[in-house]
Amino acid sequence: MCGGSFMSESQSELDKYGTNLTKTAATNKLDPVIGRDAEIRRVCQILSRRTKNNPVLIGSAGVGKTAIVEGLAQRIVAGDVPESLRNKEIVSLDLSALLAGASYRGEFEKRVKNLLEEIQKSKVIIFIDEVHTLMSAGAAEGAIAAGNMLKPLLARGELRLIGATTLDEYREHLEKDPALERRFQQVFVGEPNLEDCIAIMRGLKERYEAHHKVSISDTALVTAVELSSRYITGRQLPDKAIDLLDEAASSLRMEIDSSPVELDQLRREVDRLRLEELALKSENDPTSEQRLRSITNQLSGKQEMLNTLQASWNSERARLNQIGALKEQIDIAKQSADIAQREGRLEDASRLLYATIPQLQKNLAEKLEEQDSAPLVSDQVMPEDIASVVEGWTGIPVKKLMQKDAKQLLHLEEDLSKSVIAQKVAIGVIADAVRRSRAGLSDPNRPSGTFLFLGPTGVGKTQLVKALASLLYDGEIVRIDMSEYSEKFSISRLIGAPPGYIGHESAGQLTESVRRRPYSVVLFDEAEKAHPEVFDILLQVLDEGRLTDSHGRTVDFRNTIIVLTSNIGSRYLSDISLEATTAHEYVNDEVRRTFRPEFLNRLDEIVIFEPLSQSDICQIVDLNIESLNKRIKDRRIVVTVSEDLRRWLSKSGYDVIYGARPLRRLIQREIEDRLAKLIIEGLIHDGQTASFDLSGGAVNAQVCS
């Protein structure tokens, strides 16, 4: 009587504070576990020991530690375990449920003590996820932590416990208590390679198809693994690949459940025409009557198209729902067949395997054949869907090149030349690097391009970087002004202050910017003004495309273009007595004296910008006037400049040493200041034109309607 009563109470206590994984596995509610044979075998070996039979799974978050325990539960159900583990049960203990409501001193300890006694009697294997929480669970003032209560049982082998934790948590909590640590046997769980991860994804495919009621192509599985491995940093396989697949399937299911874009647009058009028809019916003039007849005819045609499209969509959606229901039925039938085989109900298993499932598969094949040649919505997850999710997560455009994107890349030099004048060599180098990256030919372990731009001030070095960011990177530019890093101690601002220093909690300016925007242009402006040791930090970035910040996080630079600008040797380029080849040699010599060889050797290209000529300045005048017109576009005011004034501006604003910046100041003083006075005095109004001309050596403004 006592034994029967105790087991009943024990079962209720275990149910209260835990989840029976073997029972869940017996009903096929756990996802299939593919691979991890070595880790599961090692766990079985440790559990079969006489003492210290407590494995602890240690690995990064997302590598599949919990899945290994679920795989062991499935093997116990299937009988594929050593004799010592046959008919055992694995119970996942919920420490939060054990702690909840234990408000009085000693209540938590009593719960733990009763639970441990019941576990010893029932001979179950306990699994605790985040096992490091044992160290602090219940450790209030005057109380005993759960970890200390477990130590004697763990040492004697009277309690079998499987733990799971991360490397950092293990080091921080368990290693600090050697008495508890030595009672566990470590099982390291590493990240699976790409081939193993693809096998895992294929094993999960049917479950996700049944849940989302869509089909998943094999290429989508492979794409999910490859893209997550390359573009999603800070997380581990297979977790991040599974998340990609899950979200892509969820997005597709949402599209199926809502109206297609074509149908939605047509419905809105019909609603607009109906409103216009109602408004015109109250008018009696001939024009309105004629317009009403036209609207009525349009509405009739659009309504007929809408009805046809709606009927087609209803039919297609019904077919998709039937396909989803059939897949779900097949999945349930397969699970039922597995359960029947394990329980020895061979007649039921035979009926399911050789009658029910083949019939369902036949019905599914028939429904799939009914698919329209041009469906409104696809029910299959394709690589493009996976790429869309990656783009949404990271901002990196990993979709296959669209026609317009390819056209833009082919004409990138022309587009950049509209913003940067007379620097064809530099523009060509940058454009080639971008095309290599977008075509997938660049080294996947290095940044898309690393350049050092040299030349006099005001020739367009920074402007070229801004133009590239505006065209291809949606304006995403990470700008680091190196003049702010002239002191040695300021280096820590790039990656964050080290532990123990003020500002350690704050992120580094460089690492945090790239971590948040991994697809961007990184500009190190005025590089020669920084402390020499700053460039030691950049060596790893230029060579391996990664950098570790002060918090130990690895930041990925592989999708960035890195540009450093400098004025080193600009005096040689501005010296008109030197030939271009000689000037370039002098500049390169000075660069080699300023920067270390290991730094220069990691750059893709050192680009020298040429000084601007008088004709180049004329084109820059046009660019500045165009920029001014864009700024006042909202007022509908237009600024025009006569040819005489244009030539005068280019001549007066030209300086071979200072480049185009004196011209900008001249235009600001002679044109923008005069225009500002006209606007404030009310002499020019919206929609008018301000014409600027040169008369008697002075600039005059005239307002035209």
Swiss-Prot record:
Its main location: cytoplasm. Residues 192-395 are annotated as: Linker. Keywords: ATP-binding, Chaperone, Coiled coil, Cytoplasm, Nucleotide-binding, Repeat, Stress response. PROSITE patterns: CLPAB_1 (PS00870), CLPAB_2 (PS00871). Homohexamer. The oligomerization is ATP-dependent. Part of a stress-induced multi-chaperone system, it is involved in the recovery of the cell from heat-induced damage, in cooperation with DnaK, DnaJ and GrpE. Acts before DnaK, in the processing of protein aggregates. Protein binding stimulates the ATPase activity; ATP hydrolysis unfolds the denatured protein aggregates, which probably helps expose new hydrophobic binding sites on the surface of ClpB-bound aggregates, contributing to the solubilization and refolding of denatured protein aggregates by DnaK. This is Chaperone protein ClpB.
